[in-house]
Amino acid sequence: MKKRLLPCLTLALLLALALAGRAAARTVVTTTTNLPTIQISVPSTANVYINPNRLPVQLTASTETAQIISSPCYIENLSEVPVRVHVEATGSARGGISLVGETTAGSTSKAKRVFMYFEIQAGVDPDDVTWDNEYDADSHIVIRDGDTKTKNSMVILGSAEHEKRYGVFRLTGDCIEEPTEAWNSRDSVTVRIVFTFTPLPVDTEIP
């Protein structure tokens, strides 16, 4: 009987040795998200002129005669990636001004109505920008009194090393030239503009 048990014992030992030769180990992989640092130069203030009689107004590099004129302003992308620019604008009228949602050109109103809108263009040279000829609801933001308007994806700016890294913006529009109550120095509009930026892939095509 002892001899018959030997093969079974030998097989059991071989299995035990084979199992003992197996080992397990694990690797823990930690993922880190590499996010770009967004750095944009944004002016803190700007000047807007209400110019009902279309008098010549001397700006930095030109003389303007429009009814709504703003000093030249621009943001500059100093980031390592392109950015998409979203804009939020809120108006606040003083004096007898009423901020309206459509042009006053051809209007017979005698109220102090002002039609003002925000425009931004991506450019190579902040001193040389081609502006739109007229208001476009799809591209511009109308300024309303106490009402915040938001428009997403207004422009895409190239990275700091790209020539088209400037977002040049202005406030423009028109107003009633001769209201019943004459224009005076107390009539003014303050506009609060907030920019928000979304980083884009480095190979994004810049329009």
PLM feature spans:
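Terminal low-complexity, poorly structured segments
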Residues: M1-L15, N51, L55, A137-S139, ...
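Surface-exposed interaction patch
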Residues: R26-T30, L55-V142
